Curated annotation (Swiss-Prot):
Gene: CLE33
Full protein name: CLAVATA3/ESR (CLE)-related protein 33
Xref: PANTHER family: CLAVATA3/ESR (CLE)-RELATED PROTEIN 3 (PTHR33869), CLAVATA3_ESR (CLE)-RELATED PROTEIN 33 (PTHR33869:SF24)
Residue positions where Hydroxyproline is found in the record: 67, 70
UniProt entry keywords in alphabetical sequence: Glycoprotein, Hydroxylation, Secreted, Signal
Length: 75
């Protein structure tokens, strides 16, 4: 019974230490919504990435041929 109490005490004590050891986030980072300017710039970047992907996707093709069988010198 004493070992059970000691185990509970150790677990409780370590959980208290862990909770007090953590650093709280600044209020600007803890808010769920970002600033409107940041969100707008992210939207513009994503649009530009999608536009470039579409441009490259229509022109890009691989000319590489895969080998027809195992390399005889490999094994």
């Amino acid at each position: 019974m004493a070992s059970w109490r000691m185990l509970c005490f150790v677990l409780l004590f370590t959980s208290i230490l862990i909770c007090h050891d953590a650093r709280p986030l600044p209020s600007s980072l803890s808010s769920s919504n970002g600033s409107p300017a940041f969100v707008e710039s992210v939207k513009q970047v994503v649009k530009e990435i999608m536009r470039r992907k579409q441009l490259l996707g229509t022109q890009y093709s691989t000319n590489r041929l895969s080998p027809s069988g195992p390399d005889p010198h490999h094994h």
